[in-house]
Amino acid sequence: LHLCDRRQRQMCIRDRDNLTYESESEYGVIEISLDSVVELQKTSDEHYIYMDFLTPHEVYDKVVVIDAGHGGNAPGATKQGINEKDIDLAIVLKVKELFDEAGDESVGVYYTRTDDSNPSLEQRVDMANKAGADLFISVHNNSTKSGRMSSINGTAVMYDEEKASEENGSMQLAQICLEEMTAALGSTSKGIVKGHEIYIIRTAEMPVALIEVGFMTNQDELNRLNDEAYQKEAAQAIYNAIYRAFQEGY
């Protein structure tokens, strides 16, 4: 968090431990490192800047965390010089554009990464858990086990089968995502797939869906996945799935 205000001669911040930082200069930068997901509410008067840290649900009716798979030195599937991590991120950034453009102040959306970084699996799921997210969506792309080019193609969505009996749970969310993705992309449905062994699925405390948009080991699908227009269609489908889930009671 960086907070700059040229108008204030004195700046003061107090956290829960009553830690105080003050600066008498005309310009200051306050940098705060937090171990949880919070929203900043800032007010000021002639002398002070006051900051309150609120939980996401104190600000928003609904909270979503969206994860772009892999990143950094973990490229994911790689074919013909195309890295899965880049496609995952491109789609998620286009989802972000849709939420930013909509400006829906009732929904708070957080992203595990918006650049070529590689948060640990623990950091990714911790963000969702600490934010008290209502939904956790992770975006990936698939490949065959051998990694060889193949005719196998299509969209699959993974869910937590250990929580399959829950109403409005992971399995139902996965089905919503699958239906929206295949309808928008015209891709083959590979169904919803059990994924409890996947760390972020197993440890998420809310309904989670891990979307495998397509197969990078299929030439036609690889070409589409690397196409910006197709990425926009995938992003729109994810956006639609999130709002559909809310409409269905999540």
Model-derived regions, located:
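Catalytic-core regions of hydrolytic enzymes
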Residues: D45-E179, A183, S187, N223, ...
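N-terminal post-signal-peptidase region of extra-cytosolic proteins
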Residues: R14-L19, N118-Q123, G195-H196
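Single conserved hydrophobic/aromatic residue that forms the stacking wall/gate
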Residues: H2-I13
